Amino acid sequence: MQLRHHLILTGAAAGLIAAGPATAQSVDVSITVPRLTVAEYHKPYVAVYLEATGAPARTLSIWYDVAKAKDEGRKWLNEVRGWWRASGRTGSYIADGSSGATRAPGVQKISVNAARLGGLKPGQYTLVIEAAREVGGREVVRLPFTWPLKPGQTIQAAGKTELGAVSATFKP
C-alpha cells in the first residue's frame, strides 16, 4: 500500500519557499577506514565534528567501543585528542545520540540531519574527522567550507594512514 502526502502552502509561506535560495539541510559523510596490515589490528575510534572560530565544537558522531563492560570503552576516548580537547571531555556526546560502535575497515557512511545542523550561522567552518587506534596511529582530516552550501555540493580530502578518502555531500 502506497501513501501519498501533499502539503499546500499559500500566502506568505509559499512566497518564502519560492523566493528563498536552496541551501543544504543535511549532510552525508563518507569515511574510508583502511585495512592496515599490522600484527595487532584494532578498529579505530573516530570522531566527526564541526569547528568554527569562536564557537564550541559540535560533535556529529563518535565511534568507540560502546559494548565494553562497565563502559570501559569511554576510558580511551581521550586518545582522540583534538576532539577530546574541543568537546569530548564535556561528556554531552553520549546523551545526544551521536555515539556508536567502532567500525570495520571499508567505506562507512553517516547522515547528519537538519536538526543536528540547525542554527549554523553563515560563515567559515571545518568538518573534522579524527581517528585514533590502539597500538596504532592517529590522524586528522580537515574539510573546510563556507556555510551555507548549495545542495549537491561535495567537499573531499584524504588521509594517509588511519583514514582514507573522506567526503561530505550536502543535501536539500
Put a short name on every predicted segment.
Residues G54-L120:
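Structured domain cores in non-transmembrane regions
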Residues G20-A24:
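Sec/Tat signal peptide C-region and signal peptidase I cleavage site
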Residues E40-A47, Q124:
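Short coil-to-beta strand junction motifs in C2/discoidin
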Residues A47-Y49, S61, V128:
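Beta-strand signatures of extracellular beta-sandwich domains
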Residues V29-Y41, Y64-A67:
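Short amphipathic, basic-aromatic surface patches that mediate peripheral association
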Residues M1-T10:
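Bacterial N-terminal signal peptides that target proteins for export
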Residues Q25-V29, P44-V46:
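Structural beta-strand segments of beta-rich domains
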Residues P105-V107, A115-P172:
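Glycine-rich, aromatic-bearing surface loops/beta-hairpins
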